[in-house]
């Protein structure tokens, strides 16, 4: 499969590029920066928020599917966040419709539901039917991008999978990560499952590993063929206790739900 991968120079993008290539997919890299050393394949230094530039990439490369990982990975003003996550998604979707590309896999975030209280115990997990409860403008933009994906799936019959990524790290570093961790290998498994699942329409899954202490339900991903193999519990003994642990576990978005991230929606001179 020829996969257009946005944000290909980012931390997730580099891992997914190698993982999908190892599984036989051809990666077309797209990012605002120059081609990273060692990348093999076509590369386009393009801003996904520029619809004409995005359309030109589709015209040149004829991808079979899109993996959209691009976007500012932290908090900003509301306009900055909407541009980074919603307008980029819309530009890609318009190009997909124009060039008859059927499938997109989107890197959404746990922060789309980050103000959701932590489940009371391990027998209760948060499903894909929970209402949006963003914890930041970053989370708001992920909710809005998911809504645009849902619209295009309904309007044009696209297949769109939103992966609400937890904590993508080589290994868990805090107590919260024991619930939210997504290993590098499981991330690749998740993306490939979302790319190859039979006609999912619009779907949401939680991008986490098979963590013993997980807060989110893995069943939505399993319905699409995502079978995580790693468990943060393997590292539990090496994770130090911290004074912030109790606060970070109050809501599933962790520190993003705290007052540290409260700010006006709009920047003023």
Report residues per predicted region.
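NAD(P)H-binding glycine-rich loop region in Rossmannoid oxidoreductase-like domains
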Residues: 46-85
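N-terminal Rossmann NAD(P)H-binding glycine-rich loop of SDR-like oxidoreductase domains
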Residues: 3-23
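Glycine-rich NAD(P)-binding loop of the Rossmann-fold in SDR/ketoreductase-type enzymes
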Residues: 49, 65, 80-91, 99, ...
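Catalytic helix-loop patch of NAD(P)-dependent Rossmann-fold dehydrogenases
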Residues: 83, 119-157
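Conserved beta-loop-beta element that borders a ligand/cofactor-binding pocket
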Residues: 109, 146-170
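Conserved catalytic-site region of short-chain dehydrogenase/reductase
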Residues: 75, 107-123, 137, 143, ...
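Conserved Rossmann-fold NAD(P)-dependent oxidoreductase catalytic core, especially the SDR/UDP-sugar
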Residues: 91-132
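Alpha-helical substrate-binding/gating segment
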Residues: 165-171, 181-202, 210
